[in-house]
């Protein structure tokens, strides 16, 4: 059976390759410090587990969902007003998805025709590229560079490219580069969208993992954002429910409606007990979320301080659960460095090249180990001479 030519657009799966090498080293008895994948090591909160468990006792909850529960959509509306200060979100402006990765991957099928153009950041989370490729669309990259604090710099985007683009993906706090949006940047993005009749698709997965300042927010809290954009909003990292796949598309009603129409053709909706768990997340207390943010900040400090102490350039890490580090010692091949780091130090990270053309020469490190384990990982890097 010949696979679709569409699959030829996708490269090798980096995580699978790294995992195979990791398993081989484990089998040899090597100590492994795995910071490659952004899966929280914190447990889900008790009230969330209880909500899911209780719902699962009801046989009616095991039927096809087909729709979002009205109380779930209302919980999202209320959360946006309470948490982000965004008023005016109505249930018709909310649609669930099985994780925002699935949502971003499918959005292009709802909005793009073959040959349409979208703008994506470089470096970026890989599904931003994949969603365009699946929809037979054309990718145009806009760079995230240290000179501009790894933030979108819309003045540097070719106006003719912007005029052709149907939408622009923005992701802040950013995976993989760890940058956090500012009011000035968001205002520039909104003005840019208006100037070029462009939809903004904002990925907001890490609003509760922001360091050294004000709490993270939402793109939709800025004046004019609801007129030009939508936001993918995830519960995965804030509430440690990555496997439950709980995400939402929120914003412009016509875009949400198109996305909902597509999902209705390929999916029977979110499992009802998971919807109940999502409601518990949205309506529940936030003290544990804040405590967890501080723990991530401790990990960020341990890793960045440790690497800088070895002579690495201090990584960019202002938000998200990732640290974006330049390769030390003048190295340039991120995959080769990751393999060397794994074999010599037992430290597993992700090569920057897997996040787009500008990612080469960097690695992404996930803050999924406690500070004492991070200290041991840094020591293993030192002993291996990788600095």
Q: What is the predicted role of each segment?
A:
Residues 28, 135, 195-196, 310, ...:
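Helix C-cap/helix->beta junction micro-motif
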Residues 110-132:
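Conserved PLP-anchoring active-site segment centered on the Schiff-base-forming lysine
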Residues 140, 145-212:
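Active-site phosphate-binding strand-loop segment of PLP-dependent enzymes
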Residues 222-297, 301, 305-306, 310, ...:
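Conserved core segment of the aminotransferase class I/II
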Residues 116, 137, 195-198, 226-227:
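A short helix->loop->beta-strand "cap" motif at the edges of active sites that frequently abuts
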Residues 279, 295-304, 314-326, 359:
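Conserved glycine-rich beta-strand-loop-beta hairpin in the small C-terminal domain of fold type I
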Residues 78, 331, 340-350, 355-387:
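PLP-dependent enzyme catalytic core of the Aspartate aminotransferase-like
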Residues 2-99, 106, 281-284, 386-387:
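N-terminal small-domain helix-loop-helix segment of the aminotransferase-like
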């Amino acid at each position: 059976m010949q696979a679709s030519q569409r699959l030829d657009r996708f490269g090798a799966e980096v995580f699978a390759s790294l995992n195979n090498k990791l398993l081989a080293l484990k089998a040899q008895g090597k100590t492994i410090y795995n910071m490659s994948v952004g899966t929280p090591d914190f447990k889900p909160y008790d009230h969330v587990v209880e909500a899911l468990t209780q719902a699962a006792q009801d046989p009616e909850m095991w039927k096809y969902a087909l729709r979002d529960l009205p109380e779930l959509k209302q919980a999202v509306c209320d959360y946006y007003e309470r948490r982000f200060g965004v008023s005016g979100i109505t249930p018709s402006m909310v649609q669930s998805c099985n994780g925002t990765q699935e949502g971003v991957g499918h959005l292009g099928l709802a909005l793009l025709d073959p040959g349409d153009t979208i703008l994506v950041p470089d470096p970026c989370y890989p599904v931003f590229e994949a969603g365009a490729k699946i929809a037979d669309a054309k990718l145009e990259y806009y760079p995230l560079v240290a000179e501009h604090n790894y933030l979108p710099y819309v003045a540097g985007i070719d106006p003719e490219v912007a005029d052709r683009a149907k939408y622009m993906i923005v992701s802040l706090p950013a995976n993989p580069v760890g940058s956090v949006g500012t009011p000035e940047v968001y205002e520039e993005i909104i003005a840019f969208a208006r100037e070029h009749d462009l939809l903004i698709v904002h990925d907001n997965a890490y609003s509760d993992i922001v360091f050294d300042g004000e709490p993270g927010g939402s793109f939709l809290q800025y004046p004019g954002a609801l007129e030009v954009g939508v936001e993918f909003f995830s519960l995965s990292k804030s509430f440690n429910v990555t496997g439950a796949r709980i995400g939402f598309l929120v914003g412009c009603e016509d875009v949400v409606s198109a996305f909902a129409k597509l999902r209705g053709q390929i999916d029977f909706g979110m499992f009802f007990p998971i919807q109940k768990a999502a409601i518990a997340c949205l309506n529940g207390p936030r003290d544990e979320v804040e405590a967890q943010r501080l723990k991530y900040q401790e990990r960020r400090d341990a890793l960045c301080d440790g690497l800088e102490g070895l002579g690495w350039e201090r990584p960019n890490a202002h938000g998200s659960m990732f640290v974006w580090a330049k390769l030390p010692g003048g190295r340039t091949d991120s995959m080769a460095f990751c393999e060397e780091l794994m074999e010599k130090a037992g430290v597993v990270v992700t090569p920057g090249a897997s996040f787009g053309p500008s990612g080469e020469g960097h690695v992404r490190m996930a803050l999924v180990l406690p500070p004492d384990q991070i200290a041991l990982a840094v020591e293993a890097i030192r002993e291996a001479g990788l600095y």
